[in-house]
Amino acid sequence: MGLTIAQKIIKEHLLKGEMTAGSEIALRIDQTLTQDATGTMAYLEFETMGIDRVRTERSVAYIDHNTLQSGFENADDHRFIQSIAKKHGIYFSRPGNGICHQVHLERFGIPGKTLIGSDSHTPTGGGIGMLAFGAGGLDVAVAMGGGAYYITMPKMIKVNLTGKLRPFVTAKDVSLEILRILSVKGGVGYIIEWGGEGIQSLSVPERATITNMGTELGATTSIFPSDDVTKAFLEAEGRGADWKPLASDPDAEYDRIIDIDLSTLEPLIAKPHSPDNIAKVSELKGTKVDQVCIGSCTNSSLYDMLKVAALLKGKTISPEVSLSISPGSKQVLAMLADCGALSDILASGARVLECACGPCIGMGFSPNSAGVSLRTFNRNFEGRSGTADGKVYLVSPETAVAAALTGYITDPTMLGEMPKVEVPKQFKIDDSAIITPASPEEAKDLEILRGPNIKKFPDAKPQEDELSAELVLKVGDNITTDHIMPAGAKILPYRSNIPYLSQFCFGVCDKTFPARAQEAGQSIIVGGANYGQGSSREHAALVPLYLGVRAVITKSFARIHIANLINAGIMPLTFQNPDDYEKIDQGDKLTIKNIYAGMESGAMTLIDETKGLEIPLACAFTDRQIAILKAGSLLAYTKEENA
């Protein structure tokens, strides 16, 4: 039997385990990336390992999230990251150089390599043929130290693309179509591999848009072949030597095959407040729009920006709409300036923002009260924009421009003929904003710079054989890490300060949670299906740990979050019968006995002391995960292993 693209890369990097779906495997990691909202914690964790220099082929620290410096906190954290990067062999991408995934694609991505990043949209690298995973910061820290990255061997979905996209229909619409087909839970446990003759018409940035939003499916990762299109992109970046061909075997087997004819697609839109709440743009025409944001790691490439500039050229945006443009990198911005496209954007009335994440994470440009905001981003979770009652829709750059010009949701095909856009065969290369690390000899004398906002992370709490605790919070389905640990301009600067962050934990769901959790001492959370979807932020585990949460019981978990819970020492459990979720209530006193035996057998019993009920629970821990929980955290376990 032949192998898929992903299976070939896994086989080449396999350190432990068997390539059997559902079993645990350990992978050698070639590259890592961090961003500053999660990176500070990752580097604090790396420091505690006592390793002088990273042991990956390439590790890069990006500053792209906390670029709004309204106080000392972000600037201090950036100095810390820059100093630790220089000392420990990590490349440092300065603020303003661009969004981590866009810059990594441009300057560091290599087909066939493995990459993990402390950002859930790291699978963007799949657009260039990398096996790229989003992970918690602790997993990234371990990988930087030369440790393996452990995952459950995924199943495989093949998406066959045929035909070509029509004018005004884009890669973003392909992403929204697969979300319509699979939903935000449909990719859990799968790697999604894209192929078929239709991919030949998709550039690397378009492919990266699609793999980027594979994260919204819950997929382990997504990947495209490495072909002549990939080669042309790398040559344009002056990195032709990094190219190698990569394709699935003709007799490769997949667990599911989905066929999409690109020529049949039309402009799509994701309505509030979920990326899979899909409709045709034409069905919502006439909806008044207050704000339009174009950019993010999903749609900020040179190709996207050139199309936006061409559509805006000679026109003026609606006086009722505020339009922001965030180029994905300094390279993109410089090339827009060189060819005159930036002038066309400015002349239209658009506001050009820094090359950073910005509005996507609620870092500025929040919509007005109850405002309708069309965004070319990847998530539209409630409150994520920074406006609690904001209504965020996800669209392509073309649909975004149509709304900016008309003031209403408008099918972009109504704009007339799509202007022809030519991407240069050679990109402008300027790596002056990427700081290379010091040599091992120079690094010995370098000091790590720490600001007062950097606090110690929570101590490990070894899992005991019995747990008695209050059910301090009960939540529903599709709880995101934005619900658990919100982002935004007011909170993100404190990502290195767990005690301060704790007062915002679950604030979207229940503002009384932090105080009640601390009063309880130790507690349990109960959730519905797909608990922990969204961002890879390990703070959604570390902050509940700090507040005394010892177990989370749900109908099901998102992949990255369940790993982060285990890494933090919080026990993730599921109901054997999902209907039992309805039987227990917030405030109930709960007990779980014989936990160690249950970890081994995969079954435990939850005793609801308040109601006199016994409820069967399930778990599926590997021997390694059991050892992590007993040690209290992945960090404590790693220290024990290296002692």
Predicted features and spans:
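Fe-S-dependent hydro-lyases/dehydratases of central metabolism
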Residues: M1-A643
